[in-house]
Curated annotation (Swiss-Prot):
GO terms for cellular component: apical plasma membrane; extracellular region; plasma membrane. The keyword Hydrolase applies. Residues 306-476 form the VWFA domain. May be involved in mediating calcium-activated chloride conductance. PROSITE patterns: VWFA. This is Calcium-activated chloride channel regulator 4. The keyword Secreted applies.
Length: 919
C-alpha cells in the first residue's frame, strides 16, 4: 500500500487517511472503479461473468431506492483469471489486482457452506476489506437460502462501504423482550414469522413448537425463526434483504434497540441508516432527481507479469553500504521472489538514466543470472527520478504497446526537486509504481506516484540488521499470481555481533510449504562460517558464496523436509552484522499455504491520534488461531518498538478468534516514516484452524412460512463450530509497508491516552450475586494497568449509554485492577429489590488511569430477572449445559439499588445477554 506525506500534495492527500487498498470513488452519486476478482481456483464458466453483471445491475437500482436516490453503481471492473481462455473483449488490467479487490469470487471458506460474507475487522462506520461470494451463489443455486444476488450485494455493500453490521446474531438468535416474550433477534421487530423446530429424516419432516431451555430460559439451540413469505414490513436490508417487501435500512423509527444484534453490539445501538447517513458519502451527496444510468463493465484478463527495476546509483548510494545492500536485495528478488514466466527489465539512474536490460522472460536460472549481472557497481552523480521512470516506460513499451498493468520497482535514497514533473505522465500511463525509500531523504513525490497507481511503498532505514531492504523487495510478489506460486517469507532476522560471536537459531518448514525453499545469508565485512542442518540432522552444503555482494545462498532441490531446520553462523569480523532470510513456496497447489498479511489502520497520522497494527493469519480463507504474533515498528532513527499482537476481542481487536491479531501503537519517537514488520509463530498444540463459518456472513434462511405452513430450504451442512484442527509448527514473517506520523512533540511524550474501551463485559449469576467478567484495559489503551474502575447499573440501555455518570454506581472498593489483557472478575449482590413481572438490569464500566483520563463506556451487559411463565411442557428437560462461574472472592461488593425497579416473585432466575456501546 502506497504512503504519503502532505508536503507537496497536501490538498490532494488530506482525505486519503485510511490504509485501504480499494480504489472505489464516489463521483456524482455513482460508485466508480469497483474491482470484482474471480479467484484462479474457480473453474472457467462464462456464466459467472454474466451473473456478476446481472447482479450489479439489479443491485444498482435496489441501492438507489434504498438510499433515497443517493447512490448507484457507475462502473465495475471484472478481473478474469489468467488460466481462463482468451476473448477479444478482455483487456489487460491496470492497477486492478487481488490486492485491490472489493469483491472476491472464490470457493466457499468451508466446503458446502456457500455463505456470502464481508471481511470486517475495524470499528463501526469504518470500511471493510472485501466481499466474498461463491460461484454457486452467483449462479443462482442458493437463491432460496439467501435471496436474489442483487439484493444480497446491497446487504454486503453496506458492510463494505459504510461499516454497518448485521441485524441478527447467530450466537444469540433469541432474546427476552421487555414485553416478556421471547423474540427472534431481528430488525425491524415488525418482521413476522414463526419460531419452530423443523427436522427432516428420511422422507419425512417434523415441525413442532420451540421449547424453553431451563438454564437459559430462551428457546433451545434447535429452534429457528421462519419468516413469513408475504410481509408488509420494509426494513431491514441488514436483517433479511431476501424478503420481498424489504427495501429499506432500519432507521430511528424502525430500529429494534432491544435485540442483541451485531449492529447494536458494534454500533452503540444506532440504526444502520443512522450510521450510513453519518458517512462522508452521505454528507457529500444530495438525492438525484432522475434515475441513474446502468453500470458500465470492463472485462480484464490477467496476463504475464511485466516489471522493470529502476535502481538509484547516485553518489549518495555509496554511503552506509547502501549500494551493496540494494544489490543484495535485488539479487534475492531476481533469484527467488519474481515468478517464472515474468518479464523483467532494468534501468539505472543518477543524474541521467541508462537502460541496462531490456525485458527478458524468466524461464530458468540463466535469465535470472543475466539480470543479476546488470546490477550497478559504482555510485556516482545526482538523482533524476523521472529520467529513470521514463526509461522504464521505454523498456516496457518496446515489447508492449500499452503500459497497462506493468510494474516499475523504484528504489532511491535521495530527493529530486523535479520528481513531481512526471506525476501526470505516471498517472496516465496505466503502470504501477512500487517505491522503496532508503533512508530519511527519499523523495516525497514518489510516494504520491505509488499511491495513485496502486503500488506499494516501503521505508527502509540504514540499520542493516533489521533486514528491511530484503523484506521490502521480498514483499513485491505478483498481485495476480495464484497463491501457490508466490514466494512466502518464513524467516527474516539479523544481528550485529561482537567478538566473533555466533548467531544460532532454527527455522520451521511446515507441510504447506517447502517447494523452492531458499536460504540467504548476508554480512557486512567478512564471510561467516555457515552451518545448516535439515530436520534429520543432515548438514546442508554447497552454499553459493557471492563475495562481491557479501551474500551466500542455497536453494533446496525439490520439496524441503518438513520440520525444524537449525543453523549456526559464526562472525569472522568484529563487529559484524549478519542476516538470514528464508523463503519458500506452497508444497502442493491444492493445499493453500499459511499466510500472514500485515497492515496499519492508516497510512498517514498525526500525534496524538493512536494507530492500530493488524496481522491476519489464514490458511486459504480459514483463520489460524492461537499463534504468537509480534510486530516490529521501526522509526527513521532506527528505534524499534516491539508489540505482541492479540486476537482476544479486546482493546484494538474487534473480534475474538477471527484470525486477525491487533494492537494499539502509540509509542511515537519522532516525526517521519515508520516501517512495519510482523513475525508469526505457531507452536504444536497451540496454533489451530477454526473450522467455523466466517463472521459477518449473510443470514441463512431455513425456510419460509407460506399459508401457515413451513416450506423448508435444504439444510446447511452441519459444522461443529467448536471443531478445531491443530496445526503443526510454522513460522512466517511479513512486511506491512510504511506509514508517516507528524506533529510528534519532543520526548518524553505527554500522557494523552486513556484506557481502551472494555468491549467484552459479560454478566452471569452465581447464587444471589451477579458476576461480571471482562478483559482488563491498560493505562495507555491496552498497555499497563488502570487505576480504578467505575461500574454503574440502570434499567435503561440509553441511560447508561448517554448519561453514564448519572446512573447508579456499584461499590468497587474491593476491586483491584490487573495488568492489561488479564481476565478480570467482580461479584456484587443486588439489594432492596421491588417486585414486578420482569425487569432488565443493564451494567457498564468505565476505566480511569493514573492521569485521571477516562475510557469510553464499555459494552453494556444485560441481566434479566423474571419468573418463568412458560408451561412446564415447554421446558426442555435436557437443557444446554453451561458452566457455573465461580466468583472472585476478593471482588465481592453489595449495591443498594432501591431506586432501580427489579422483579422478583417467588424464585428469581437471572439470564444474561451481551449488548454493546461504542461512544
Amino acid at each position: 500500500m502506497g504512503l504519503f506525506r502532505g508536503f507537496v500534495f497536501l490538498l490532494v492527500l488530506c482525505l486519503l487517511h485510511q490504509s485501504n487498498t480499494s480504489f472505489i470513488k464516489l463521483n456524482n452519486n455513482g460508485f466508480e472503479d469497483i474491482v470484482i476478482v474471480i479467484d484462479p481456483s474457480v473453474p472457467e464458466d462464462e456464466k459467472i461473468i454474466e451473473q456478476i453483471e446481472d447482479m450489479v445491475t439489479t443491485a444498482s437500482t435496489y441501492l438507489f431506492e434504498a438510499t433515497e436516490k443517493r447512490f448507484f453503481f457507475k462502473n465495475v471492473s471484472i478481473l478474469i483469471p489468467e488460466n481462463w481462455k482468451e476473448n477479444p473483449q478482455y483487456k489487460r488490467p491496470k492497477h486492478e489486482n487481488h490486492k485491490h479487490a472489493d469483491v472476491i469470487v472464490a470457493p466457499p471458506t468451508l466446503p458446502g457452506r456457500d455463505e456470502p460474507y464481508t471481511k470486517q475487522f475495524t470499528e463501526c462506520g469504518e470500511k471493510g476489506e472485501y466481499i466474498h461470494f461463491t460461484p454457486d451463489l452467483l449462479l443462482g443455486k442458493k437463491q432460496n437460502e439467501y435471496g436474489p444476488p442483487g439484493k444480497l450485494f446491497v446487504h454486503e455493500w453496506a458492510h463494505l462501504r459504510w461499516g454497518v453490521f448485521d441485524e441478527y446474531n447467530e450466537d444469540q438468535p433469541f432474546y427476552r423482550a421487555k414485553s416478556k416474550k421471547i423474540e427472534a433477534t431481528r430488525c425491524s421487530a415488525g418482521i413476522s414469522g414463526r419460531n419452530r423446530v423443523y427436522k427432516c429424516q428420511g422422507g419425512s419432516c417434523l415441525s413442532r413448537a420451540c421449547r424453553i431451555d431451563s438454564t437459559t430460559k430462551l428457546y433451545g439451540k434447535d429452534c429457528q425463526f421462519f419468516p413469513d413469505k408475504v410481509q408488509t414490513e420494509k426494513a431491514s436490508i441488514m436483517f433479511m434483504q431476501s424478503i420481498d417487501s424489504v427495501v429499506e435500512f432500519c432507521n430511528e423509527k424502525t430500529h429494534n434497540q432491544e435485540a442483541p444484534s451485531l449492529q447494536n453490539i458494534k454500533c452503540n445501538f444506532r440504526s444502520t441508516w443512522e450510521v450510513i447517513s453519518n458517512s462522508e458519502d452521505f454528507k457529500n451527496t444530495i438525492p438525484m432527481v432522475t434515475p441513474p444510468p446502468p453500470p458500465v463493465f470492463s472485462l480484464l484478463k490477467i496476463s504475464q507479469r511485466i516489471v522493470c527495476l529502476v535502481l538509484d546509483k547516485s553518489g549518495s548510494m555509496g554511503g552506509k553500504d547502501r549500494l551493496n545492500r540494494m544489490n543484495q536485495a535485488a539479487k534475492h528478488f531476481l533469484l527467488q521472489t519474481v515468478e517464472n514466466g515474468s518479464w523483467v527489465g532494468m534501468v539505472h539512474f543518477d543524474s541521467t538514466a541508462t537502460i541496462v536490460n531490456k525485458l527478458i522472460q524468466i524461464k530458468s536460472s540463466d535469465e535470472r543470472n543475466t539480470l543479476m549481472a546488470g546490477l550497478p557497481t559504482y555510485p556516482l552523480g545526482g538523482t533524476s527520478i523521472c529520467s529513470g521512470i521514463k526509461y522504464a516506460f521505454q523498456v516496457i513499451g518496446e515489447l508492449h504497446s500499452q503500459l497497462d498493468g506493468s510494474e516499475v520497482l523504484l528504489l532511491t535514497d535521495g530527493e529530486d526537486n523535479t520528481a513531481s514533473s512526471c506525476i501526470d505522465e505516471v498517472k496516465q500511463s496505466g503502470a504501477i509504481v512500487h517505491f522503496i525509500a532508503l533512508g530519511r531523504a527519499a523523495d516525497e513525490a514518489v510516494i504520491e506516484m505509488s499511491k495513485i497507481t496502486g503500488g506499494s511503498h516501503f521505508y527502509v532505514s540504514d540499520e542493516a540488521q533489521n533486514n528491511g531492504l530484503i523484506d521490502a523487495f521480498g514483499a513485491l510478489t505478483s498481485g495476480n499470481t495464484d497463491l501457490s506460486q508466490k514466494s512466502l517469507q518464513l524467516e527474516s532476522k539479523g544481528l550485529t555481533l561482537n567478538s566473533n560471536a555466533w548467531m544460532n537459531d532454527t527455522v520451521i518448514i511446515d507441510s504447506t510449504v517447502g517447494k523452492d525453499t531458499f536460504f540467504l545469508i548476508t554480512w557486512n565485512s567478512l564471510p561467516p562460517s555457515i552451518s545448516l542442518w535439515d530436520p534429520s540432522g543432515t548438514i546442508m552444503e554447497n552454499f553459493t558464496v557471492d563475495a562481491t555482494s557479501k551474500m551466500a545462498y542455497l536453494s533446496i532441490p525439490g520439496t524441503a523436509k518438513v520440520g525444524t531446520w537449525a543453523y549456526n553462523l559464526q562472525a569472522k569480523a568484529n563487529p559484524e552484522t549478519l542476516t538470514i532470510t528464508v523463503t519458500s513456496r506452497a508444497a502442493n497447489s491444492s493445499v493453500p499455504p499459511i499466510t500472514v498479511n500485515a497492515k496499519m489502520n492508516k497510512d498517514v497520522n498525526s500525534f496524538p491520534s493512536p494507530m492500530i497494527v493488524y496481522a491476519e493469519i489464514l490458511q486459504g480463507y480459514v483463520p489460524v488461531l492461537g499463534a504468537n504474533v509480534t510486530a516490529f515498528i521501526e522509526s527513521q532513527n532506527g528505534h524499534t518498538e516491539v508489540l505482541e499482537l492479540l486476537d482476544n476481542g479486546a482493546g484494538a481487536d474487534s473480534f475474538k478468534n477471527d484470525g486477525v491479531y491487533s494492537r494499539y501503537f502509540t509509542a511515537y519517537t519522532e516525526n517521519g516514516r515508520y516501517s512495519l514488520k510482523v513475525r508469526a509463530h505457531g507452536g504444536a498444540n497451540t496454533a489451530r484452524l477454526k473450522l467455523r463459518p466466517p463472521l459477518n456472513r449473510a443470514a441463512y434462511i431455513p425456510g419460509w412460512v407460506v399459508n401457515g405452513e413451513i416450506e423448508a430450504n435444504p439444510p446447511r451442512p452441519e459444522i461443529d463450530e467448536d471443531t478445531q484442527t491443530t496445526l503443526e509448527d510454522f513460522s512466517r514473517t511479513a512486511s506491512g509497508g510504511a506509514f508517516v506520523v507528524s506533529q510528534v512533540p519532543s520526548l518524553p511524550l505527554p500522557d494523552q491516552y486513556p484506557p481502551s474501551q472494555i468491549t467484552d463485559l459479560d454478566a452471569t449469576v452465581h447464587e444471589d450475586k451477579i458476576i461480571l467478567t471482562w478483559t482488563a484495559p491498560g493505562d495507555n489503551f491496552d498497555v499497563g494497568k488502570v487505576q480504578r474502575y467505575i461500574i454503574r447499573i440502570s434499567a435503561s440501555i440509553l441511560d447508561l449509554r448517554d448519561s453514564f455518570d448519572d446512573a447508579l454506581q456499584v461499590n468497587t472498593t474491593d476491586l483491584s485492577p490487573k495488568e492489561a489483557n488479564s481476565k478480570e472478575s467482580f461479584a456484587f449482590k443486588p439489594e432492596n429489590i421491588s417486585e414486578e413481572n420482569a425487569t432488565h438490569i443493564f451494567i457498564a464500566i468505565k476505566s480511569i488511569d493514573k492521569s485521571n483520563l477516562t475510557s469510553k463506556v464499555s459494552n453494556i451487559a444485560q441481566v434479566t430477572l423474571f419468573i418463568p411463565q412458560a408451561n412446564p411442557d415447554d421446558i426442555d428437560p435436557t437443557p444446554t449445559p453451561t458452566p457455573t462461574p465461580t466468583p472472585d472472592k476478593s471482588h465481592n461488593s453489595g449495591v443498594n439499588i432501591s431506586t432501580l425497579v427489579l422483579s422478583v416473585i417467588g424464585s428469581v432466575v437471572i439470564v444474561n445477554f451481551i449488548l454493546s456501546t461504542t461512544i
